[in-house]
Amino acid sequence: MTLSRTALIVAWLHCFVSVSLAQDAVAPRARGEVSAAPIAAHRTGDFDAILSVRSPESGTRRWGERFQFAGDLERWDYDLAAESFGLYVPPAYDPEGEPYGVVVWVSPVDDGGIPAELRPVFDQRRLIWIGPNNAGNQRHLYPRAGLALDAALNVDRFYSIDPDRIFISGLSGGGRMSAMQAVAYPDVFAGGFSIIGVTTYLSILVGPGSGQLVPQFPTPPPDLLKRSKQQPFVVMTGSGDFNREECQLTAAAYERDGFTDLHLLDIDGMGHEMPSAEHFARGLDLLLGPPD
């Protein structure tokens, strides 16, 4: 039986969670018991918070339309008040000073907070980190995607933010999610940084020796895709990463399709793991572009 392109896309969307979970990942950061409070404007430091407003784009109807998803999303919908997010806002942040950039992080595990070694990287680049908790690979892709959109909206409401410096990044299964979001939402995210996991709307080999070429999510509308192709997109893998070939092939496919600011970082000695602070900073700097 030969499946149509649409049927293959829908099948992939339904199995996204199990594929991501099977490929997995890293341990969460050590942080003990943390209680989340409602987000407060301009709070600095490393903390968990509850956000207040759903993004219009994270509703089931709007999200389903954007991704041409024919299934029932209602059973996967979520209550934002029951969710929490890890944030890191550098201590030098000043609401009266220069606006900060944002990295929305999609984790493969249930802790969305920043690893301690990355704090100086964010301090130096005037960036805020925000990542949903309880949004690892075991969770359906719809709430994972929706929570990232909610994160982008709320951090912009409560902080002084440069809208041209709101990015999305993720690791392993979260890297796949970040690629999908960066390409499908160039009106929300100014670029994407996918680490040891990436996905595409283009047709690539689904597995070694399969001989089958399939897209992994629907092609975005032409106006959005045109904008995505002009934004920075960074893919990071390593010599010991079991997703290395897929990352290489996917990055090459994006470049062939006209992504003009595509960067593949292939780190010698890096496995399927969180990169060092030095290598993470390299990816961020490609995302941010040269200083003004």
What are these regions (language model features)?
Residues A7-S18:
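Bacterial N-terminal signal peptides
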Residues Q23-Y100, A252, L262, D292:
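A domain-start/cap signature at the N-terminus of enzymes
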Residues P91-E98, H140-G173, V183-V188:
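Gly/Ser-rich "nucleophile elbow"/oxyanion-hole loop immediately N-terminal to the catalytic nucleophile
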Residues H279-D292:
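Catalytic active-site module of serine/aspartate enzymes centered on a nucleophile-bearing elbow/loop
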Residues T200-R282:
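The feature captures the conserved acid-bearing segment of alpha/beta-hydrolase catalytic domains
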Residues G113-I130:
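Short amphipathic alpha-helix adjacent to the substrate-entry channel of hydrolases
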Residues G97-V109:
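Short beta-strand element of the alpha/beta-hydrolase
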Residues D164-K226:
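Primarily recognizes the serine-hydrolase "nucleophile elbow" in alpha/beta-hydrolase
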